[in-house]
Amino acid sequence: MSAKSKASGLSRPATASGLAAKGAPRDDGIVQHFPGLSLTGWLERLERLHPSTIELGLDRVRRVKDALGLDPAFPLIVVGGTNGKGSTCAYLEAILGAAGYKTGLYTSPHLLRYNERVRIAGQESTDAALVQAFEKIDAARGDISLTYFEFGTLGAMAQFIDGGVDVAILE
């Protein structure tokens, strides 16, 4: 089953529940924990949690980051711009890896599987590692609303810290 994008005519996978991120219900503010969810279950849940309006700013993410104690001791390389971000990140990962650095790479969006977004030392994150990171974030956030992307970014940082990377590259 897929949902058509009116603008592009492209199809995107619908969630198993049939809810797409746009128009999905908001989080009701009740703190619930969901142990035992698979990665697919977490991703579907994160799509439903996405607020209908995005609150600009970094305050919410900072509060959750602080609650988790995510203070990386390694350098962060942020690659931004319009074109070439993915290639630049891949080059940086390869160059730094060849120089003996243990790299963390976070990219978005993924092409086939969510796991592609988070890599440590060139290896995609496992479902179990992603689920563990999402569980930590969910427990720490309390009633703070986070977007799908913010959950993913915090999850990547948690994995990079736990994985002992020397440098992280963020697209």
List each language-model region with its residue ranges.
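Short functional linear segments
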Residues: S2-K6, D27-G81, T88-A90, A94-A99, ...
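A cross-taxon signal for low-complexity, glycine/charged-rich
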Residues: M1-R26
